[in-house]
């Protein structure tokens, strides 16, 4: 198992949930956290603990976004019209690494970030190597021509464990994806329940 896989599955073990719905997640075999003391029964969480856990789970899902970056996204969400929790999800789904993952150009969020950083992705015909780049409605995301035949890209497009959400239009023959609209929480294909309202409560303390 690679270091990236270990880090990814460590998040699953810490949360006690298979947050990406991956068949190989260790929590499919056990329901306790990592380490030798992982099997100890956990006490009931305080309200703060529940809110913190919700934040950690959402941060972890999006490939362990740093606290500084996550809080910056939250602040932006509060400045937009509408529900701050819904806005938070919408902003996270507009990240380029999220769209690349959703389009099934790669198999994991972590791989999406690396794929972009290495210059394999174009947005509206121009190469973008910043994984946090904010995609706009109507943007066309595509895999660079020389990268389309990479084995892991071809394998990812065939993954049956997840579908492309309807707010992204994908042409797997051309390896392109059009960002159709900003999704609501209920549109996003999370494998586990996400509770952005608890994150709003956490930062509002």
UniProtKB/Swiss-Prot annotation:
Keywords: Ribonucleoprotein, Ribosomal protein, RNA-binding, rRNA-binding. It comes from the Bacteria. Residues 18-46 are annotated as: Disordered. InterPro entries: Ribosomal_uS4, Ribosomal_uS4_bac-type, Ribosomal_uS4_CS, Ribosomal_uS4_N, S4_RNA-bd, S4_RNA-bd_sf. GO terms for cellular component: small ribosomal subunit. The keyword Ribosomal protein applies. Residues 94-157 form the S4 RNA-binding domain. PROSITE patterns: RIBOSOMAL_S4, S4. GO terms for molecular function: rRNA binding; structural constituent of ribosome. GO terms for biological process: ribosomal small subunit biogenesis; translation. Part of the 30S ribosomal subunit. Contacts protein S5. The interaction surface between S4 and S5 is involved in control of translational fidelity. Belongs to the universal ribosomal protein uS4 family. NCBIfam families: PRK05327.1, rpsD_bact. One of the primary rRNA binding proteins, it binds directly to 16S rRNA where it nucleates assembly of the body of the 30S subunit. With S5 and S12 plays an important role in translational accuracy. This is Small ribosomal subunit protein uS4. It comes from Rhodopseudomonas palustris (strain HaA2).
């Amino acid at each position: 198992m690679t270091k990236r896989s270990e880090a990814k599955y460590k998040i699953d073990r810490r949360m006690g949930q298979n947050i990406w719905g991956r068949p190989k997640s260790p929590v499919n075999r056990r329901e306790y956290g990592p380490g030798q003391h992982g099997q100890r029964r956990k006490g009931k969480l305080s309200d703060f603990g529940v809110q913190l856990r919700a934040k950690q789970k959402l941060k972890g899902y999006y490939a362990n976004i740093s606290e500084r970056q996550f809080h910056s996204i939250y602040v932006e969400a509060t400045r937009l019209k509408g529900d701050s929790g819904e806005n938070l999800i919408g902003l996270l789904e507009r990240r380029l690494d999220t769209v690349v993952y959703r389009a099934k150009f790669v198999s994991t969020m972590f791989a999406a970030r690396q794929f972009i950083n290495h210059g394999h992705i174009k947005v509206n015909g121009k190469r973008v190597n910043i994984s946090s780049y904010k995609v706009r409605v109507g943007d066309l995301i595509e895999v660079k021509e020389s990268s389309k035949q990479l084995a892991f890209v071809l394998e990812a497009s065939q993954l049956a464990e997840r579908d492309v959400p309807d707010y992204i239009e994908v042409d797997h023959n051309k390896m392109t994806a059009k960002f159709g609209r900003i999704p609501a929480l209920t549109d996003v294909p999370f494998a586990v329940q996400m509770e952005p309202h608890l994150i709003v409560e956490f930062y509002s303390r």
